[in-house]
Amino acid sequence: MQQSKEERVHRVFEKISDHYDRMNSVISFKRHVAWRKDTMKRMNVQKGTKALDVCCGTADWTIALAEAVGPSGEVYGLDFSRNMLKVGEEKVKERGFQHVTLVHGNAMSLPFPDNTFDYVTIGFGLRNVPDYMTVLKEMYRVAKPGGKVVCLETSQPTLIGFRQLYYAYFRYIMPFFGKIFAKSYEEYSWLQESAREFPGMDELADMFRQAGFVNVQVKPYTFGVAAMHLGHKPDGR
């Protein structure tokens, strides 16, 4: 019987959790750290605020948010892979954070009330969900009026020549790295499939607007290999 996208993604991340951080660095040549740092700068996270990291995985962005809001703030990380969360829990424990809560849950139906968070993020997770718009609307729902919702994700490079190299890298080399470093050729084949099928920057910006966000900002990284989308939930909504 053919697996649904959600079932396949869940199986992938349950299997690669122990190698995920290392492979992230290998695949992106460690650029994902710089991309997230720049995104955080643009978010201008304030002390004492409340944030949610959707599809938090091993909690790297969750931890960055926790450092930004400080001990007077509050941060939640949510993921549907218990194995990924276990890795994240160890990181949170090592840092002694008392204001971070990791939650096992589904991005398609966030277990939080409306208008709860000042910041809602999703990093390299939106491409893996069954329905992009459903998740964007859920993030919109739980954001406070005036809150910021941010997606950092792979994108579709527009530079001629570089785009072809990018697709060749994702299709052939990345799964090979997965086989060498994580013994998971099939799983990393899935990651390149999801990246290839994900909307480009302009299309995703339009989806943000359709979900209700205003003042949508887009920042491409490394010739469009990745992109940040930042939207605001209107005041009074």
UniProtKB/Swiss-Prot annotation:
GO MF term set: demethylmenaquinone methyltransferase activity
Binding-site residues, S-adenosyl-L-methionine: T58, D79, N106, A107
One family name in Pfam for this protein: Ubie_methyltran
Reactions the enzyme catalyzes: a 2-demethylmenaquinol + S-adenosyl-L-methionine = a menaquinol + S-adenosyl-L-homocysteine + H(+)
GO terms (BP aspect): menaquinone biosynthetic process; methylation
Function: Methyltransferase required for the conversion of demethylmenaquinol (DMKH2) to menaquinol (MKH2).
Protein name: Demethylmenaquinone methyltransferase
Organism: Anoxybacillus flavithermus (strain DSM 21510 / WK1)
